[in-house]
């Protein structure tokens, strides 16, 4: 580029900056701000949305009861199978960086739980997935999901 070309380019930059600065400082802030829609969502709006999507809302207490009943039914199903078998004990070693899916897979492989996916879902749904600690734990095949999780979170 020639000296003239560079001067023209610099002049254009200065002019554009001046125009943007003038617009920024001279316009009304309310006019420049995006229109904020302060619409409050009512319970009726939520219910209409849930009905349109064919969904159901459940409060936390009922949800926890449903999780517990699911766990009990899973334990009853697996309990009838394991009553004939003897109780297995396994020393689980959880290392730093292991995910709940890794732990679930190990427990299923060792015969402590019947389904790694169900156990992993329970841990995440109950909110324990961030509380599982590294270390060595003794778990038994007759323990419920809740007891296993309490053992792993101590």
UniProtKB/Swiss-Prot annotation:
InterPro entries, alphabetized: MLTG-like
> What domain of life is recorded for the organism?
Bacteria
UniProt entry keywords in alphabetical sequence: Signal
A Pfam family reported for this protein in Swiss-Prot or TrEMBL: YceG
Is Signal set as a keyword in this record? yes
Q: Taxonomic lineage per UniProt? A: Bacteria, Bacillati, Bacillota, Bacilli, Bacillales
Q: What protein am I looking at?
A: Uncharacterized protein YqzC
- Position of the signal peptide: 1-33
């Amino acid at each position: 580029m020639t000296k003239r070309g560079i001067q023209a380019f610099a002049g254009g930059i200065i002019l554009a900056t001046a125009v943007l600065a003038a617009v920024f400082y001279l316009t009304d802030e309310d006019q420049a701000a995006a229109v904020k829609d302060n619409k409050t969502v009512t319970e009726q709006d939520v219910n209409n949305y849930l009905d349109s999507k064919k969904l159901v809302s459940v409060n936390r207490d009922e949800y926890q009861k449903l999780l517990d009943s699911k766990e009990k039914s899973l334990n009853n199903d697996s309990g009838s199978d394991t009553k004939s078998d003897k109780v297995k004990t396994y020393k689980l070693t959880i290392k730093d960086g292991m995910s709940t899916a890794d732990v679930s897979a190990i427990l299923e492989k060792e015969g402590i739980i019947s389904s790694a996916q169900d156990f992993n879902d329970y841990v995440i749904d109950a909110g324990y997935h961030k509380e599982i600690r590294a270390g060595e734990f003794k778990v038994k095949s007759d323990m419920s999901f809740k007891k296993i999780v309490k053992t792993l979170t101590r």
